[in-house]
Regions:
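Active-site environment of divalent metal-dependent phosphoester hydrolases
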Residues: 429-431, 458-462, 487-489, 541-543, ...
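Stable alpha-helical elements in mature extracytoplasmic
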Residues: 434-437, 441, 465-468, 472, ...
Length: 645
């Protein structure tokens, strides 16, 4: 029994460490190995999938060298890589450290699977624990925080993982006698194989939907009648705590089998469908309940199957774990590559959920009565431990809601004679060195009164699952209005020191562009007078200027302003001599950056193109126009002072 408890603890801690590495590795692929929207998505996907294909050899290594030695060595490499990443090396060092940590983590999973036939409790606690930690940190990982807090907590996590792994290995019972490497009965089932197959899909569904604190936040600020289809500052961690409660309750406590076979798979499928249709709150709640229940279903089946503690059974579980992680990689690449290649991607989360549901139901239907010597069907953890874990993690998730209070709406003041405006494509908060450095972004925007942001990420798992908008708004002390573009958690935003009274969004027609785009209009109260602001990020069709989208934005902006002073800006992906640029000037708008032309903003390390722009309505004048050199993004920000009439 103690061995089971230690193995469960070691697995939970290892999952948390592996998720930390994945939160660095995924964005490193698209910022360091290549650049999203520049490097072919096929090449990025091939590089990412290659590591998971390489890990398919891990079960053979485990079978030949033994799960104990391989598991401990892999755990050591995983822990060392995780700790080294806390130094935030950036550049190639970050990429290859993360790759080494990922591969070690995949080998470690195969080794653990060889000796742990019932992983559901460990997987559930690891997923929930990592999510709660992410929420407590405001979605900014320890790896990116650094400093005394980052190093001390990282060292504590890594030390606990290594200690639990070492002690669990020492107390692990020997493999079952009587069934050797080569004479295992071919008809004998392998306990835990299906449960391990769910490891990878569960990691994805939890990190992308069910247990994603950034997604909780993004969903919390919606629903205002003055801002239809938009999001304001909101704290979604409290309802997120309910998702943690649902997930752990269904994963650690079994419902009646006949009921569970129907309710949990249906809940999981419904949650995935709601996610791809943009209904985020019911999506993550249903996915959390369904995912936990499906893990419990697979675990119950593993408990009832015949014993197979030999080397061959361990290898089968290891292969299942490796295949499950390959599913994780394929589904992740398939979902996010669509934003570069332009195909529908809603099927990816739904297909992943369907796979989990089918495996869980199939496993429960194949369960047989326990036989002498079979693994006990009792829960892996005693009731007191399960209740304590459920209550403790749920309470900590609720505590996170009090630690990260979003900025409140600014008060109206005396009408200013001028406002300081900035427009910045922040590339999800990642700098040229591949590090998430929102402090650097905030430094570039400090002192601005109105900020127009492009490529704002509020929870993409591909980027590590951060709410970059909330983190940046907290640093600047500025409320925001967010408009979805590519999907509900990726788009454009306006931050302002002045109160935002209302807002609108207009989805732009794709015209062949693979990534979604929109135009966000926000009305600001400047103390007795109003300023209309429009933020957008035009997406050019392959090989063409975004003329049609520029025309749509210009028409929307003119109509939205309705005679009020107007500022329009963002990453427009067009040069001053291009037809799309002329759509704005032809609509009567004035190039606010003209006094400083040429003002090249991209790429940030060698600016050659003028694609980030700000336009104003006639009567407004611009001065102090700058594009300061910085590596905080792959674009340079543009800043200017706009004098009001």
């Amino acid at each position: 029994v103690r061995h089971r408890h230690l193995s469960t603890l070691a697995l939970a801690l290892g999952i948390a460490v592996l998720l930390d590495v994945l939160r660095v590795w995924l964005p490193s692929v698209i910022t360091l190995f290549g650049r999203a929207a520049e490097t072919p998505a096929e090449l990025l996907g091939a590089f990412a999938l290659g590591w998971f294909l390489l890990a398919l050899a891990a079960p053979t290594l485990v079978r030949r060298a033994g799960s104990g030695p391989v598991g401990l060595v892999a755990a050591g490499v995983l822990a060392a890589a995780r700790l080294a990443l806390t130094a935030q090396p950036g550049g190639p060092a970050q990429l290859w450290l993360a790759c080494a940590g990922l591969l070690a983590g995949l080998v470690w999973l195969a080794a653990v699977a060889a000796s742990v036939p019932r992983p559901a409790a460990g997987l559930a606690l690891g997923l929930a624990g990592n999510a709660v930690g992410h929420a407590l940190l405001g979605t900014e990982d320890l790896v990116w925080r650094g400093g005394a807090l980052g190093w001390s907590l990282s060292a504590l996590l890594v030390a606990a993982f290594l200690a639990a792994s070492t002690v669990a290995r020492r107390r692990r019972p020997a493999a079952s006698a009587g069934v050797g490497d080569g004479d295992a009965a071919p008809h004998m089932r392998t306990p835990g194989r299906r449960a391990w197959l769910l490891c990878g899909p569960a990691l994805l569904l939890a990190s992308q939907v069910a247990l994603a604190p950034a997604l909780w936040n993004a969903a919390a600020g919606t629903g205002s009648p003055d801002f239809p289809g938009l999001a304001r500052p909101g704290n979604g961690v409290l309802p997120g705590a309910f998702a943690v409660l649902l997930f752990l309750a269904t994963a650690l406590f079994r419902a009646p089998l006949r009921l569970a076979r129907v309710v949990w798979p249906l809940a999981l499928l419904a949650g995935s469908v709601l996610f791809v249709t943009g209904r985020l709150v019911p999506a993550y709640l249903l996915t959390a309940a369904g995912l936990g229940g499906c893990l419990a279903l697979a675990d119950s089946a593993a408990a009832d199957e015949r014993p197979a503690g030999d080397v061959r059974a361990g290898a089968r579980r290891g292969r299942a774990a490796a295949l499950g992680m390959l599913v994780f990689a394929v589904a992740t690449v398939a979902y996010y590559a669509a934003y570069d290649l332009g195909y529908p991607n809603g099927w990816a989360p739904v297909a992943t959920a369907l796979l989990v549901a089918l495996v869980a139901v199939g496993a429960s239907l194949r369960s047989v009565p326990a036989v002498p010597g079979a693994t006990s069907s009792a829960p892996v953890l005693p009731t007191l431990v399960r209740v304590a874990a459920l209550g403790g993690l749920t309470a900590l998730a609720g505590l996170a809601a009090t630690l990260h209070v979003p900025p409140t709406n600014a008060r109206a003041a005396t009408a200013p004679a001028a406002v300081r405006v900035a427009a910045y494509n922040i590339r999800m908060g990642f700098g040229l060195d591949g590090r998430l450095d929102l402090d650097a972004v905030a430094r570039e925007l400090h002192g601005s009164d109105v900020i127009l942001l492009s490529e704002v990420d509020r929870g993409w798992w591909l980027n590590g699952g951060h709410d970059t908008l909330a983190l940046l708004a907290g640093r600047l002390g500025m409320p925001y209005v967010f408009a979805p573009a590519a999907d509900p958690v990726w788009g454009d935003a306006v931050l302002s020191r002045f109160p935002a009274r209302s807002g609108q969004t207009r989805r732009l027609t794709a015209h062949g562009a693979p990534t979604g785009a929109q135009a966000l209009g926000v009305t600001l109260d400047l103390g007795g007078r109003e300023l209309a602001v429009v933020a957008t990020h035009l997406q050019p069709p392959p090989g063409r200027d975004p003329v049609e989208q520029a025309r749509e934005v210009a028409e929307f902006a003119r109509r939205y302003a309705n005679g009020r002073p107007l500022v329009v800006g963002g990453d427009l992906n067009t040069e001053p001599d291009d037809p799309a640029f002329a759509e704005f000037t032809g609509a009567g708008l004035v190039d606010a950056l003209a006094p400083a032309r040429p003002l090249r903003t991209s790429p940030a390390d060698d600016p050659r193109t003028q694609i980030d722009h700000v336009f104003v309505s006639p009567g407004l004048t611009a001065a102090e126009v700058r594009a300061p050199r910085t590596g905080a993004s792959d674009h340079l920000p543009v800043t200017l002072t706009v004098t009001l009439p």
